[in-house]
């Protein structure tokens, strides 16, 4: 079995006068690009700071963090969320980092999103440190569900990958999220080239035993050191081949839609319950044609793609007195020029300057 490639958009970009490529972005309606894709999923990075130092993300000494006055205030962020939902048709908001749990006003931000009309689905991606004591409060604030990044349930492997000996804290956070009703609890894993395939098997077994849904993600070129190499990526086909040696997998029959993960049903076994596992083949089997995301960084920049090399500055507009219509127009223009695909496999691909920790997952 192999994953299915969704490929690049089939809606051609025109280039002549009066064409889609030459015309301005629509002034209303869905938040579309020139390839016909509509963005309904907003990814919001709340901070570039993180309390782990994962080897594929940032160096051991950390990075130069954004200064406090560069970050959007809760009031500024609430305004952009309102514009996104009320004027641009956003139906889902995911808060990310860096690590969003280091943000003290996280519950306030979640509550502001939950108060919007129409109310969007509100989700969070976190490394799980501190989640055990905040899961209940986040649920009360309006959080619907959660994704926890966890690359290994082997303590030594976890410490090597994250440069922190904190696996018990993450596992406690997962349990607290489930107890708080932030379900389905999903686990996001990026496989380490050294131990990743073994880790994938044990992760899936652990998730099935505890009622979590595992998503395994191909490592992407978003590390701060720009040392990513395609040859080191454990691709989706190898992941599936390995899992099939230990579990009985069948393709999930539900339409995939714009979801990045291709799902597989896992049959019950002697050591685990039945469940699902997803594989996100970001590199080897692009799904850019179905992308429905728009991204807002912690310092107020709009990115149309994880791998964009251009950004649109909404913070400047916010602080310069722009009205909602002007901000909406800038956001629409940013998304209108979204590229056809991420370009990772192009010979002239250039990694974005911002690392993943400063963009948000």
From Swiss-Prot:
<feature type="binding site">
    <location>
        <position position="98"/>
    </location>
    <ligand>
        <name>S-adenosyl-L-methionine</name>
    </ligand>
</feature>
<keyword id="KW-0004">4Fe-4S</keyword>
<keyword id="KW-0408">Iron</keyword>
<comment type="subunit">
    <text>Monomer and homodimer.</text>
</comment>
<comment type="similarity">
    <text>Belongs to the radical SAM superfamily. MoaA family.</text>
</comment>
<dbReference type="InterPro" id="IPR013483">
    <property type="entry name" value="MoaA"/>
</dbReference>
<dbReference type="GO" id="GO:0005525">
    <property type="term" value="F:GTP binding"/>
</dbReference>
<dbReference type="InterPro" id="IPR006638">
    <property type="entry name" value="Elp3/MiaA/NifB-like_rSAM"/>
</dbReference>
<feature type="binding site">
    <location>
        <position position="43"/>
    </location>
    <ligand>
        <name>GTP</name>
    </ligand>
</feature>
<feature type="binding site">
    <location>
        <position position="125"/>
    </location>
    <ligand>
        <name>GTP</name>
    </ligand>
</feature>
<keyword id="KW-0411">Iron-sulfur</keyword>
<feature type="binding site">
    <location>
        <position position="305"/>
    </location>
    <ligand>
        <name>[4Fe-4S] cluster 2</name>
    </ligand>
</feature>
<feature type="binding site">
    <location>
        <begin position="293"/>
        <end position="295"/>
    </location>
    <ligand>
        <name>GTP</name>
    </ligand>
</feature>
<dbReference type="GO" id="GO:0006777">
    <property type="term" value="P:Mo-molybdopterin cofactor biosynthetic process"/>
</dbReference>
<feature type="binding site">
    <location>
        <position position="57"/>
    </location>
    <ligand>
        <name>[4Fe-4S] cluster 1</name>
    </ligand>
</feature>
<keyword id="KW-0501">Molybdenum cofactor biosynthesis</keyword>
<dbReference type="InterPro" id="IPR050105">
    <property type="entry name" value="MoCo_biosynth_MoaA/MoaC"/>
</dbReference>
<feature type="binding site">
    <location>
        <position position="54"/>
    </location>
    <ligand>
        <name>[4Fe-4S] cluster 1</name>
    </ligand>
</feature>
<feature type="binding site">
    <location>
        <position position="56"/>
    </location>
    <ligand>
        <name>S-adenosyl-L-methionine</name>
    </ligand>
</feature>
<feature type="compositionally biased region" description="Low complexity">
    <location>
        <begin position="16"/>
        <end position="30"/>
    </location>
</feature>
<dbReference type="Pfam" id="PF06463">
    <property type="entry name" value="Mob_synth_C"/>
</dbReference>
<feature type="binding site">
    <location>
        <position position="186"/>
    </location>
    <ligand>
        <name>GTP</name>
    </ligand>
</feature>
<keyword id="KW-0456">Lyase</keyword>
<dbReference type="GO" id="GO:1904047">
    <property type="term" value="F:S-adenosyl-L-methionine binding"/>
</dbReference>
<comment type="function">
    <text>Catalyzes the cyclization of GTP to (8S)-3',8-cyclo-7,8-dihydroguanosine 5'-triphosphate.</text>
</comment>
<dbReference type="GO" id="GO:0061798">
    <property type="term" value="F:GTP 3',8'-cyclase activity"/>
</dbReference>
<feature type="binding site">
    <location>
        <position position="149"/>
    </location>
    <ligand>
        <name>S-adenosyl-L-methionine</name>
    </ligand>
</feature>
<keyword id="KW-0342">GTP-binding</keyword>
<dbReference type="InterPro" id="IPR010505">
    <property type="entry name" value="MoaA_twitch"/>
</dbReference>
<comment type="pathway">
    <text>Cofactor biosynthesis; molybdopterin biosynthesis.</text>
</comment>
<dbReference type="GO" id="GO:0061799">
    <property type="term" value="F:cyclic pyranopterin monophosphate synthase activity"/>
</dbReference>
<dbReference type="InterPro" id="IPR007197">
    <property type="entry name" value="rSAM"/>
</dbReference>
<feature type="binding site">
    <location>
        <position position="94"/>
    </location>
    <ligand>
        <name>GTP</name>
    </ligand>
</feature>
<feature type="binding site">
    <location>
        <position position="50"/>
    </location>
    <ligand>
        <name>[4Fe-4S] cluster 1</name>
    </ligand>
</feature>
<dbReference type="InterPro" id="IPR013785">
    <property type="entry name" value="Aldolase_TIM"/>
</dbReference>
<dbReference type="GO" id="GO:0046872">
    <property type="term" value="F:metal ion binding"/>
</dbReference>
<keyword id="KW-0949">S-adenosyl-L-methionine</keyword>
<keyword id="KW-0547">Nucleotide-binding</keyword>
<dbReference type="InterPro" id="IPR000385">
    <property type="entry name" value="MoaA_NifB_PqqE_Fe-S-bd_CS"/>
</dbReference>
<feature type="binding site">
    <location>
        <position position="220"/>
    </location>
    <ligand>
        <name>S-adenosyl-L-methionine</name>
    </ligand>
</feature>
<protein>
    <recommendedName>
        <fullName>GTP 3',8-cyclase</fullName>
        <ecNumber>4.1.99.22</ecNumber>
    </recommendedName>
</protein>
<feature type="binding site">
    <location>
        <position position="291"/>
    </location>
    <ligand>
        <name>[4Fe-4S] cluster 2</name>
    </ligand>
</feature>
């Amino acid at each position: 079995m192999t994953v299915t490639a969704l490929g690049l958009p089939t809606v051609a970009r025109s280039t002549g006068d009066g064409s889609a490529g030459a015309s301005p972005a629509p002034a209303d309606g869905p938040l579309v690009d020139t390839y016909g894709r509509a963005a309904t999923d907003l990814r919001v990075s709340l901070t570039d700071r993180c309390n782990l130092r994962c080897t594929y993300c940032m160096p051991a000494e950390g990075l130069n963090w954004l200064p406090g006055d560069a970050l959007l205030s809760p009031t500024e962020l609430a305004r952009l969320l309102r514009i996104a939902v009320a004027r641009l048709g956003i139906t889902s908001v995911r808060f990310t980092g860096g690590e969003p749990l280091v943000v003290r006003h996280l519950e306030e931000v979640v509550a502001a999103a939950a108060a919007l009309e129409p109310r969007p689905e509100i989700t969070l991606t976190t490394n799980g440190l501190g989640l055990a004591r905040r899961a209940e409060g986040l649920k009360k604030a309006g959080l619907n569900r959660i994704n926890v990044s966890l690359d290994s349930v082997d303590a030594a492997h976890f410490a090597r990958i994250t440069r922190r000996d904190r696996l018990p804290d993450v596992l406690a956070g997962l349990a607290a999220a489930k107890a708080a009703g932030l379900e389905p609890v999903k686990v996001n894993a990026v496989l380490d080239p050294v131990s990743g395939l073994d880790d994938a098997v044990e992760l899936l077994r652990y998730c099935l035993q505890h009622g979590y849904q595992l998503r395994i993600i191909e490592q992407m070129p978003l590390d701060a050191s720009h040392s990513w190499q395609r040859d080191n990526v454990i691709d989706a086909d190898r992941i599936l081949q390995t899992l099939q040696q230990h579990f009985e997998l069948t393709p999930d029959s539900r339409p995939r839609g714009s979801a990045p993960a291709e799902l597989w049903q896992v049959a019950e076994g002697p050591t685990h319950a039945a469940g699902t596992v997803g594989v996100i083949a970001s590199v080897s089997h692009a799904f850019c044609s179905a992308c429905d995301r728009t991204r807002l960084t912690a310092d107020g920049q709009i990115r149309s793609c994880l791998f964009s090399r251009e950004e649109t500055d909404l913070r400047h507009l916010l602080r310069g007195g722009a009205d909602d219509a002007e901000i909406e127009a800038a956001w629409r223009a940013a998304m209108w020029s979204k590229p056809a695909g991420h370009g990772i496999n192009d010979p002239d691909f250039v990694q974005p300057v911002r690392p993943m920790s400063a963009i948000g997952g």
